[in-house]
């Protein structure tokens, strides 16, 4: 750390900004272009808000109504590349926790990656991402995730798609015949119900793969704020009196053909809870003939909707990258039935500390990483991302994609067993 808002660049691929000695350096390739002499990588301050907002407008058309355009606070790390006093590129690293294999995995949620129009095609996006990943590792993140806008760039940086956040619409007629089931009672949520809602979500996250935990500073909401963020939250109460599911929803404006009833979360621990919450959404059909839902992964909602007409209106691809191989493999949970040793070799230019030979020992739902011999499989950083996320990806598929080479049939069998499990999902856009 050079000062309160200055940090050194990290690693051999920090081509811009400060050298490892902490002194600012020139980039001869940029000098030759005549457009840029030197850039500095540092954290953003409130004084940078105008430049950051201008860049966001250029890149994404924001600010979006109802969302803060520039926030600083616990759990949010904003970084920039500066050409003198001019902000040339920026990123945001949000402190998240992903749940993989039932265990928490510290995550850098990357967003707002942008380069000013006057500084594009100079490699600044790659440079700032490389430095941001190094800083994320320094604060303890072991994986990084993002919603892609430039797939070629992010794949070249070692990210690979593991999930999709899908927004879909369907006519209420597709829900015809659904009723609140006798074993379920619906009621409106109050602030006191927020812990039960969080418990429902966390159980589903533990049973899934890659969902965010919705804990930590970036999800710091009071019980009242959690419930009041929507027009309504409806609970599905089971026979024992437990909260078996909930739906958070917004009624929308007006009524008639163009009115839409939007469901943000529709989560249930039982089929009765899910079906009953769908029936609640259908009950608005006289005034809102269209229902909008958000889903991801193997959502049982798909299997409980009786009619036709489901149309995906927005699909956001979710990518993952392994930032710290050893810690990422050791933090996540693995199938309890998997036991064995896998020798893995990795070449990682963006996160060079991952490069090397690794011996992964699986036992009892956990894994340990030790120095390896190089006698097993070779895996690319993108292959490593898919390996860590799991979800039934197979070694054969990784080989066809050029992400896996070498090793033996026994290695492939062990890989397939380790990668078995729930399909990755994500329900939070950032």
Describe the role of every protein-language-model region:
Residues 10-16:
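Aromatic (phenylalanine/tyrosine) cluster motif
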Residues 28-95, 100-109, 175-220, 257-261:
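Short amphipathic alpha-helix that is part of the acyltransferase structural core
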Residues 29, 34-37, 45, 183-430:
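Intrinsically disordered, low-complexity, positively biased terminal segments
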Residues 81, 92-93, 115, 236, ...:
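GNAT/GCN5-related N-acetyltransferase fold signature
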Residues 88-89, 163, 244-245:
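A structural microfeature
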Residues 112-115, 121-134, 271-282:
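Conserved acetyl-CoA-binding loop-helix of GNAT-fold acetyltransferases
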Residues 129, 134-148, 286-296:
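Conserved GNAT acetyl-CoA-binding A-motif
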């Amino acid at each position: 750390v050079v000062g309160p808002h200055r940090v050194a660049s990290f690693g051999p691929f920090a081509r811009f900004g400060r050298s490892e000695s902490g002194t600012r350096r020139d980039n001869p390739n940029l000098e030759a272009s005549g457009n840029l002499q030197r850039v500095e990588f540092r954290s953003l301050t409130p004084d940078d808000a105008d430049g950051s907002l201008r860049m966001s407008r250029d890149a994404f058309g924001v600010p979006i109504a109802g969302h803060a355009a520039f926030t600083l606070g616990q759990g949010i790390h904003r970084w920039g590349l500066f050409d003198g006093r001019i902000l040339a590129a920026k990123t945001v690293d949000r402190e998240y926790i992903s749940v993989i294999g039932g265990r928490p995995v510290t995550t850098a949620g990357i967003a707002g990656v942008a380069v000013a129009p006057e500084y594009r095609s100079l490699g600044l996006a790659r440079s700032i991402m490389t430095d941001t990943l190094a800083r994320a590792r320094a604060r303890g993140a072991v994986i990084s995730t993002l919603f892609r806008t430039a797939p070629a760039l992010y794949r070249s940086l070692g990210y690979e798609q593991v999930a999709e956040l899908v927004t879909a619409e369907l006519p209420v007629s597709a829900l015809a015949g659904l009723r609140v089931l006798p074993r379920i009672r619906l009621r409106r949520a109050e602030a006191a119900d927020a812990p039960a809602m969080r418990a429902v979500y966390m159980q589903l996250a533990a049973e899934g793969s890659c969902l965010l935990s919705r804990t930590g500073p970036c999800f710091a909401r009071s019980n009242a704020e959690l419930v009041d963020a929507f027009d309504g939250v409806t609970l599905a109460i089971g026979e024992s009196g437990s909260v078996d599911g909930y739906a958070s929803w917004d009624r929308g404006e007006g009524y008639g053909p163009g009115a839409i009833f939007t469901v943000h979360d529709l989560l249930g621990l039982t089929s009765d809870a899910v079906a009953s919450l769908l029936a609640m959404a259908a009950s608005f059909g006289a005034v809102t003939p269209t229902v909008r839902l958000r889903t991801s992964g193997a959502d049982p909602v798909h299997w409980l909707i009786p009619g036709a007409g489901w149309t995906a209106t927005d699909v956001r691809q979710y990518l993952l990258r392994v930032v710290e191989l050893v810690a990422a493999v050791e933090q996540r949970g693995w199938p309890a039935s998997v036991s064995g040793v896998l020798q893995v070799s990795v070449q990682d230019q963006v996160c060079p500390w991952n490069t090397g030979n690794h011996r992964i020992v699986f036992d009892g739902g956990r894994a340990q990483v030790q120095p390896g011999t190089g006698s097993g499989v070779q895996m690319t950083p993108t292959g490593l991302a898919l390996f860590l996320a799991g979800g039934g990806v197979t070694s054969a598929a990784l080989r066809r994609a050029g992400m896996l080479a070498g090793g033996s049939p026994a290695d492939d069998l062990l890989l397939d067993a380790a990668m078995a499990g729930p399909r990755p999902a994500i329900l939070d856009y950032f």
